[in-house]
Structure formats: structure tokens, C-alpha cells
A protein has these predicted regions:
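Active-site pocket-lining/capping segments in soluble small-molecule metabolic enzymes
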Residues: 1-259
């Protein structure tokens, strides 16, 4: 599994990164990043919607990089320009439907960042043949009201290996430097997390000790189609977290002791 880290992280972590993402407002640092991290792909990301790029500079970056440069964009017009210039790119927003995925494939993206519900149909996503990236620490990214994020996108560190067949890059979104570094250690190095799952997954507001959750839960989530929100009867995610709820475990143990 490849890991993408933001350029603001310390040198200790950037040396381990497969990809380093830098905001366009800091694009003057791209040359330094090429030199300091010769094994990493440098991703230049739009800082603001509608931001104007200096395409002459970007052409230079791409030429010097020799296959280690890419753009992360939010605007289709800019994506079309990048395609015309032969510069690798992908759209930074999460893809939720197969219709979007097909359109982006036809556009010529180098990656797609996926979100629910297609996150729960990994075999179908794989069939499109487009490299996939996932922000593993965010249960949902829209501003719609949600109960708790239980039926959202979350990947346990222990189960990251199950996604290697489907996902090419893990990244971390919307967190401070110290938390992103901690998440890298947890997912890439320790590969386990004993505490509450909601402590490492943003927008997951439901208790459950991660060490008590069985890997079979993830095996079920890979291709379940998120039928739980389509009128289906599946409650696996809720049951898994309920069985890992420390208060419920304590109450169960106390009840057993009283027998």
C-alpha cells in the first residue's frame, strides 16, 4: 500500500512517504521536494477553487520530475488543460457513483478518490481499471446530517491489508500535523489500534473498542453495496460496534458475575 502525506509533516515522515501533497500556494517548494525526496511522487494540489495556475511552471515541474509529479484538481477545465499538456492529474473530490467514475475514467485521470456508496462495491470499482485512493480516516465528507457515521467509510488499521487488492493509495484528510503523523504510525507501522475506533475516524460518533471488532466485519463491508441504507436488513456494522462497546461489555460481565 502506498501512503500520501502532506508536505507540512516533519522530515522523518516525508522520508517514508510514497507521495507528498503540497498546496499550490506553496508551489515554489516543489523543486526542493524533488531533491529531498527522490523516491516520492510530488502532488501539487489546488489551494482554492478557481485558482489560476502558472502552467509554464507546471510544465517545468513535470519535465524535471520524470514521472514523479501529478496534479490534484477540483476544476474540470483545469483537468482538461492538464490532459492537453500531458500532465498526470486526478480530481481531489470523492467519487460517489459509478457514473462519475466512468466519466473520470474517460477524462483520463490517473486516480480516483472514492467515497460511499461505491466504497462498499469494491469488486465493481476494481473492474473499471482506474487506480484508487481513499482517505481512510473520515467516515463521511459531506455536510448532510448523519446519525453517527457507522455506515460510512472507515477502515481499521488491522484490516488495511484486505484493501490492497482494490486500493492503491491511503491518505489522511482534514487533520492537524500531529494527528496525521500519528495516523501514519498507526496504519503503516503499528497496523493496529487498541482504543476507541471513533478516536481515529473523523465523523464516526459511535462508541466501540477497535480491538474488539472482528476482521470478518471488514470482509462483509468490502462488497455489501451499503444495502443497510437502501432498505436492507443488514446491521453488521452496528452489531460489531455494539459488541465492542465497553459499557455494554462491562454490564454483561457484571450480569454474568451475579449468576
Amino acid at each position: 500500500m502506498k501512503y500520501c502525506l502532506h508536505s507540512r509533516l516533519s522530515n522523518e515522515y516525508l522520508l517514508k512517504a510514497n507521495e507528498i501533497k503540497v498546496k499550490y500556494r506553496d508551489n515554489k517548494s516543489v523543486f526542493d521536494l524533488f531533491e529531498k525526496y527522490p523516491e516520492a511522487t510530488i502532488i501539487l494540489e489546488e489551494s482554492l477553487a478557481g485558482e489560476e495556475f502558472n502552467w509554464n511552471d507546471i510544465i517545468k515541474y513535470n519535465k524535471i520530475a520524470q514521472g514523479r509529479f501529478m496534479l490534484c484538481l477540483g476544476d474540470i477545465a483545469m483537468a482538461t488543460k492538464a490532459k492537453e499538456l500531458g500532465i498526470p492529474f486526478y480530481m481531489g473530490y470523492p467519487v460517489k457513483t459509478f457514473y462519475e467514475l466512468e466519466g473520470l475514467k474517460n477524462l483520463g485521470v490517473s486516480y480516483v478518490r472514492i467515497d460511499v456508496p461505491i466504497f462498499f462495491s469494491m469488486n465493481k470499482v476494481k473492474a473499471f481499471g482506474v487506480p484508487v485512493r481513499v482517505a481512510v480516516n473520515v467516515a463521511y465528507v459531506d455536510m448532510l446530517p448523519r446519525d453517527n457515521g457507522v455506515c460510512g467509510l472507515w477502515i481499521r488499521p488491522e484490516d488495511a491489508w484486505m484493501y490492497e487488492e482494490y486500493v492503491d493509495v491511503f491518505e489522511f484528510s482534514g487533520c492537524e500535523i500531529s494527528k496525521e503523523e500519528a495516523l501514519y504510525r498507526i496504519y503503516a507501522e503499528q497496523k493496529e489500534w487498541p482504543g476507541e475506533l471513533q478516536m481515529i475516524i473523523s465523523n464516526l460518533n459511535y462508541p466501540g473498542l477497535n480491538r474488539m471488532i472482528l476482521p470478518e466485519v471488514t470482509d462483509s463491508r468490502l462488497n455489501c453495496g451499503q444495502r443497510c441504507v437502501q432498505g436492507g436488513a443488514c446491521r453488521i456494522c452496528y452489531r460489531a460496534l455494539d459488541l465492542a462497546n465497553r459499557d455494554k461489555i462491562r454490564a454483561y460481565v457484571e450480569a454474568i458475575d451475579q449468576l
